[in-house]
Amino acid sequence: MRVLAIPGSLRATSSNAALLSAAGSVAPAGTEITLYDGLGGLPHFSPDLDVEPIPAPVAALRAQIGAVDALAISSPEYAHGMPGSLKNALDWLVSALEPIGKPVLLVSASPSGARHAHAQLLEVLRTMSMQVIDGGAHVFSRAKLDASGGITAPELLAALATGFAQLAEACAPG
């Protein structure tokens, strides 16, 4: 299974990027995970720009999504919602064919638990006709990271392993 992992934060030391990076150690054998790092390079969405030729960063994101079997998105919560940069990326994908029907594991990690952002993301992804596997919203603080940014909380690793197993099942033929 090939997965594009999208951290919803632009922060250099993002806990959500750390969560997705840890997925490689708990995902089913044979899983290839690519961490998307272009969120900050996407132009602000405008329907006027969503015509051929579309902006290169948008074309690259759509191509990356088209080349994988599934997505994994992890988002923090800012002011009771998903970050604007993540919503911007999703807005660029609304008119694209690549995400339709694609399985997506959604997890949200934030010191507050990210419940509001998680609910927003569920609504948006379902509206986009994506096959959402709800990995849940988790209370996640920097205290659960080691010095190299690895996750030290066994309960988070277990939840991530379960989510990726469900994602693999959703990608299985038949």
Question: PLM features: residue spans?
Answer:
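N-terminal beta1-alpha1 ligand-phosphate binding loop
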Residues: M1-T31
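Short, glycine/serine-rich, charged loops/turns that create anion-binding
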Residues: L10-R11, G40, L97, P111
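Short hydrophobic segments within beta-strands
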Residues: I6-G8, Y36, V107
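N-terminal beta-loop-helix "entrance" segment that forms/cooperates
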Residues: G38-P55, L145-S148
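Short beta-strand elements in bilobed, periplasmic/extracellular small-molecule ligand-binding domains
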Residues: T31-G40, H44, V132-F140
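Glycine-rich phosphate/pyrophosphate-binding loop and the adjoining helix
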Residues: Q131-G174
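A general structural signal for well-ordered alpha-helical segments in protein cores
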Residues: V3, N16-L20, L42, V58, ...
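Helix-loop-strand module that forms the ligand-binding subsite of alpha/beta enzymes
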Residues: P53-Q131
